[in-house]
């Protein structure tokens, strides 16, 4: 059996919304960032020269497309990423103190 990847991760891939300042009316401004521990680890390993792949599911929506493009841009193989029209990509709102 031939090994194609050094590391393959299975798990969550989502959008983290984090505060990035305040509006003129004092409301928090939110920034959308790719998140999910499995792909964070894969991105680091990819930068260290490892060949990586991800298995998971996102919605067939703008956020899901953005996440696919993001992991592909850093070299993570996305053949195992399912884009499902019947679900929405997970959004996490991160509150910092």
Please give the residue ranges for each predicted region.
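Short pre-catalytic strand/loop immediately N-terminal to key active-site residues, enriched for Gly-Thr
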Residues: 25-35
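Alpha-helix C-terminal capping segments
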Residues: 33, 40-51, 94-96
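Short secondary-structure boundary/capping elements
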Residues: 5, 10, 33-40
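Positively charged, low-complexity intrinsically disordered leader regions
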Residues: 1-24
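Conserved N-terminal subdomain of the carbohydrate kinase-like
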Residues: 51-97
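Short, glycine/charged-enriched secondary-structure capping and boundary segments
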Residues: 22-25, 68-70
């Amino acid at each position: 059996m031939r090994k194609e990847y050094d590391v393959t991760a299975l798990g969550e891939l989502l959008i983290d919304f984090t505060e990035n300042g305040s509006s003129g009316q004092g409301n928090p401004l939110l920034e959308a960032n790719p998140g999910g521990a499995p792909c964070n680890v894969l991105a680091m390993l990819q930068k260290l020269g490892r060949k990586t792949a991800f298995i998971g599911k996102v919605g067939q929506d703008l956020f899901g497309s953005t996440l696919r493009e993001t992991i592909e841009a850093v070299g993570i193989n996305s053949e195992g990423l399912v884009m499902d029209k019947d679900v929405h990509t997970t959004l996490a709102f991160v509150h910092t103190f």
